[in-house]
Amino acid sequence: MIKIANAPCSWGALEFDLEGQAAGYSLVLDEMQKTGYEGTELGDWGFMPTDPVKLKEELRKRELTLLGAFVPVALKDRSTHAQGIESALKVARLLAAVEGTTPFIVLADDNGKVPERTLNAGRVKPGMGLNDSEWEAFAEGAN
């Protein structure tokens, strides 16, 4: 059987500011449940409760599973790697407390705060990519 899940970003809860206000986590979870989704991604840290007991209860009463979390890290910048590790571990501890070992982390480049990337979304050209030094830092950060 295929199970389908969604993420708070589908309701406008994003790691970077966009126009408008995102719905609160209760509405998002209610609508996920009513639509028939079986699980959710965590969303940005603080969007859903960060107390594992509270989060587990919110998910349980809607019969939803916590599948994973998106953790953005500015991978091309070595100075952010230590903080990225801390963020990933903080999220991993919450996921483990709520669902055990089944959820996963999606480690992604935090390019949502890079104006050149956001202003050219969907139209990024090769010249806007990383240079050799940034690729090396990116690879180190991802490993």
Language model features with spans:
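N-terminal pre-domain/capping segments
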Residues: M1-G100, G127-N143
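Active-site groove signature of glycoside hydrolases
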Residues: L95-G127
